[in-house]
Amino acid sequence: MPTMRGGLRLRRRPLRLRLPLRLRGAELYAIEAEDHYLRLHTSRGQDLILMRLGDAVGELEGLEGAQAHRSWWVARRAIADVRRGDGRAVLTLKDGTEVPVSRTYSRQLRAAGWY
């Protein structure tokens, strides 16, 4: 989405162009918010970029995924396992990363057939 600065319209670089070169073309597993940064979990490793989670999720059209927590977005095909216990769920990704599922998003994921 364009932003205004000094009367000029500036376009932000899309998420795919913000990725470090070594991660371009990698399968995106998850996005984790860390303060003002996002940690991208991919098939080629992880890296941080400066971007808001909501903006990044808005640019993921065509990739099936969902928020699992206020600070996590997960690609459905990246999930290797789901554990549930004590009223909580944890998603384990292909790379071994464990993603907490909040109660708020748990209902939505269950309704969508994720577990």
Residue positions per predicted region:
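Short, charged, intrinsically disordered terminal tails
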Residues: 110-111
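Conserved binding/recognition cores within well-folded domains
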Residues: 2-94, 98
